[in-house]
Amino acid sequence: MDRQPIISAKDVEITFSLRGRKLNAIRKCSLDLYEGETLAIVGESGSGKSVFTKNFVGMLDANGKITGGSIMFEGRDMTKFTEKDWLGVRGKKIAMVMQDPMTSLNPLKKIGKQIQESIEHHQGLKGEEAKKAAIEMLGKVGIPDPERRYEQYPHEFSGGMRQRVVIAIAAACRPQILICDEPT
């Protein structure tokens, strides 16, 4: 039996509307991702890597539109998903680590609570059990003294440490696919 990809994008085209004009941002982009595989999308700055991958979690900007192709996941075309469909996929099955950790974290909420919320929502753990799992995730991503750091706010972390927190939030969901948009 042939191996089937977890996700398969075929000839995806994305257009943006800007000041009454159409801008073709992605033209006939395709990929297949298989279980256990690491796949890198490489290109120049501004080449559309982020625009393309945001479609795997339903986060295309409001002025953007998929104008061609398909993205198949679990036998369904994601280009046809409604917001309700995305609620069952985003985070739980496919998670994404965005480029800028400061725009991914809530500056008014402690780091640990942000990870804990992800665990509670996607793993179904509650209270102390979820808190313990959040502290474990901080340790797994290399945050020293995770018990103390759990109680701190994003501004108390370096840029690299904030990025690791965002990775912890995404990984805590235990997704089938983890998309990392320049997670350095």
Language-model regions, residue ranges each:
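Conserved ABC transporter NBD signature motif
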Residues: 66-77
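Conserved signature/switch motifs of ABC ATPase nucleotide-binding domains
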Residues: 91, 155, 173
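Hydrophobic anchor residue at the start of the ABC signature
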Residues: 115, 167
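Conserved ABC ATPase signature
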Residues: 152-157, 161
